Amino acid sequence: MIPLKYRSFYARAAAGLLCLSVLFSPWYGRFTVHAAEEQDILSACHAYQKRLSSVKKEADIAAYGFDIIENQVFSMTVKAFGDVSMIPAMDRTYHRLVLFFTDEDGNTVYSTDQLETNNQVRGELRQLNQGISAVSFQDLDGDDKMDILLITSCEKNDSAAGKAYKVGDVLFQNEHGFYRDWRLSDKINRFGMNKSIRFIESFLVDGYSTEFLYTASTLDELKEHGFAVAEELSSWRTFEKLGSLLVVPGTYRMAEYTVFMVYLVNEQGYIVWSFQPMGDYENLYTLKGVACRDIDGDGMKDLAVLARYSYEGKDGEMVLENDYSIYYQKTGGFYPDTELRKQYQSKDDSTMEELVETARAYWGWRQES
């Protein structure tokens, strides 16, 4: 994230770093890549960075292969450059998002593609970006400079909730432009606080966080942080491999969203296992049931959850969807179902009893009369 006068140096350095990230990503060493393929990757990295650094004016954006997201262009004041237009654009070839900043004469004074949304597929140029869901300009750190809150939409085949998910990010303004604190971006996305601008703001400004839902070791710790147990659905169950455990479904309210989790807690109050049935959904609308029964016929109790969730549609509308999760108890713990989901989708009027019987029938159980 370097100003215009250093751009040629930045382009060379960024190209090198991007290529290194591709060549030495965690998975890369698992595959044999021929020298010609390595050269192709290096050439692609350099070609992309050359196009990016060649954008000197707003008119160059489209000419060098970037499509401006017209409805997300905003004016703002940047201390280093004065009044500018923030122009987000999507690279046509690799679906990478770039933020260009231009002055009143249309000159590009700053640009960056160093965004969390461009790191969804580690070590690759091609990303999953589909567009921008929300942008907000706020002074988040109290230095009298406007920072940028950004939420993008990414899509891949194996995600739930319309096969799309959100990625949150924050760019803090400094004396030279903007910088990212990757630790904050990591927490925003790793702990599901990327659902809305208000959600991210609640974390960054108000100090609330969902992190404890994933790191707490006891039920008391969960409750101390505001986790609300669904007492009517909480009960003791004997799990063949884990012993007597309290099944604890519950919620945590942050901003305008309700986060849903299920825990298994032992007699000493320690969390033995946790489940995240929401997946990529944004909000729990209604919890319809939690059941502990042997579903796959191996003599061990499994866990089934049925709920109604909500998420934001492509046009900003709220979408409601019934969905279920089944976790099979095995020797090493619990494993989520992947087979039944290929054949059975719950309906708006589906019940927990119907779900359990359908799942048991799939595994060869005789229907109960």
Predicted regions and their residues:
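Beta-propeller-forming repeat regions
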Residues: V33-L140, K145-I295, M300-S369
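Gram-positive cell-envelope targeting signals
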Residues: M1-E37
